[in-house]
A protein has these predicted regions:
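Export/targeting segments at the very N-terminus of extracytoplasmic proteins
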Residues: 1-11, 55-64
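Proline- and acidic/polar-enriched loop/turn elements at helix boundaries
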Residues: 4-7, 17, 45, 170
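Extracytoplasmic and endomembrane cell-envelope/extracellular-matrix remodeling and assembly machinery
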Residues: 35, 39-67, 72-173
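Alpha-helical scaffolds flanking conserved acidic
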Residues: 1-7, 23, 71-76
Length: 173
């Protein structure tokens, strides 16, 4: 079910960049991405790599779940940060997500609304026809991971592969 988090975070867009500089399908902040094994420097930013970012997000969500012992609080802390959620729990003396969000005093609106949006996305995604969505199944385009020993101009890669540069860029956010 957590696979639907990127639907809310980024609409599954690898190139998504928030006002706060969170990046990729999982919208990792730079420091959080690095803490969870993603490279982010002047040369490469793995937050935009859907495969690597998904592995990092699974690791991070598992850490948050261990920290809070509850998936709703883990998801809230994925959005608002674990420190913010811990402070809200301490100030309110409440350790249940729904009770914590019943007041506007402890967590910002974005974090209070985040878990219900994820849960709604899960319900709709599992029953699209029931909610008026006619989704046709698509077969993913086969791709292959290729690691190059050095930086290469994507125009040359596109030429070698016989595809458009835009296609190469889309596969290499």
């Amino acid at each position: 079910d957590l696979a639907y988090v990127p639907l809310i975070e980024s609409a599954f867009k690898p190139t998504a960049l928030s006002r706060a500089n969170a990046r990729g399908v999982w919208q990792f902040m730079r420091a959080t991405g690095i803490e969870n094994g993603l490279a982010a420097d002047w040369y490469i930013d793995e937050r935009a790599d859907p495969q690597k970012a998904t592995v990092a997000a699974a690791k991070y969500l598992k850490t948050l779940h261990r920290m809070f012992g509850d998936w709703h609080l883990a998801m809230a802390s994925y959005n608002g940060g674990p420190g913010r959620v811990q402070r809200a729990m301490k100030r309110s003396r409440i350790d249940d997500f729904w009770d914590l969000t019943s007041s506007t005093r402890f967590l910002p609106r974005e974090t209070r609304d985040y878990v219900p949006m994820i849960l709604a996305a899960i319900i709709i995604a599992k029953n699209p026809a029931q909610y008026g969505f006619d989704i046709l199944p698509r077969t993913p385009t086969p791709t292959e991971d290729v690691t190059l020993p050095a930086a290469v101009d994507l125009r040359r890669v596109a030429e070698w592969a016989g595809v458009a540069v835009d296609d190469i860029q889309q596969l290499n956010p």
